[in-house]
Amino acid sequence: MKVLMQRVSEAHVDVSGRTVGAIDNGLLLFIGIEKHDDTALVDRMVERIIGYRVFADERGKMNWDVRDAGGALLAISQFTLVADTRKGRRPSFSSAADPVLARPLYEHCVAQLKAHGLPVATGVFAAEMQVSLVNDGPVTFMLEM
């Protein structure tokens, strides 16, 4: 499982010209599910996301997590995140989970994020989406499990 996490001052995702998810201050999460992933791994990743300290405290130091900062989450499925790009000029998606496995794991991830009591917006699984964001910092981290 890979999650590209970006601290944003605003972000929204559109499908067919309609906004389906939007947040202000918070984290934009691009979520890639791999073949070997399971709910236990997703649960560990969620705990990591929620507790990751990427927001500035009153002294300007990155000491606050998304809860401390009063932030929200925008979760978007993105299978291209798990592409193998080490060889050639065409990405290989052989490690990406089949949608039959990936969809329930993505939905589990979203449910676990919501269970922490934070506002969570989402894209649409397997849809063609347009994502707009203002990266705050910029602050971007690749989380892998």
UniProtKB/Swiss-Prot annotation:
Gene Ontology CC terms: cytoplasm
Keyword Lyase: no
EC number: 3.1.1.96
Top EC group: hydrolase
Subunit structure as annotated in this protein's UniProt entry: Homodimer.
Record text about domains: A Gly-cisPro motif from one monomer fits into the active site of the other monomer to allow specific chiral rejection of L-amino acids.
Name the record gives this protein: D-aminoacyl-tRNA deacylase
Source organism of this protein record: Alcanivorax borkumensis (strain ATCC 700651 / DSM 11573 / NCIMB 13689 / SK2)
